[in-house]
């Protein structure tokens, strides 16, 4: 087991220095963008369509599972709680490091479907 691969009980908080958080975040993004990760997410997106309920049922769990596979190498539990703990840790570093903030924003884009513009967007209001 490498020095980066630690296991921590689910109830134990994992604390990583900024550089290691950046490294883990980079690995998560790479996993989501890998051919396997992309295929899993694309399948979930296609099956979800524009239905937010289906996005929550299909896309979100697929993205969380991909994150879990990476984050357990950094001592986070291999469950949803581990992903939430990592998200809180990332949030705590966002204001300190613009690169982490940008990476975090990119990560969120995998979870949140693009929002369509309302049909009236960009049109001026009718005059009375």
Curated annotation (Swiss-Prot):
<protein>
    <recommendedName>
        <fullName>Protein C10</fullName>
    </recommendedName>
</protein>
<comment type="similarity">
    <text>Belongs to the UPF0456 family.</text>
</comment>
<keyword id="KW-0963">Cytoplasm</keyword>
<dbReference type="GO" id="GO:0009791">
    <property type="term" value="P:post-embryonic development"/>
</dbReference>
<dbReference type="Pfam" id="PF14974">
    <property type="entry name" value="P_C10"/>
</dbReference>
<dbReference type="GO" id="GO:0005737">
    <property type="term" value="C:cytoplasm"/>
</dbReference>
<dbReference type="InterPro" id="IPR026317">
    <property type="entry name" value="P_C10"/>
</dbReference>
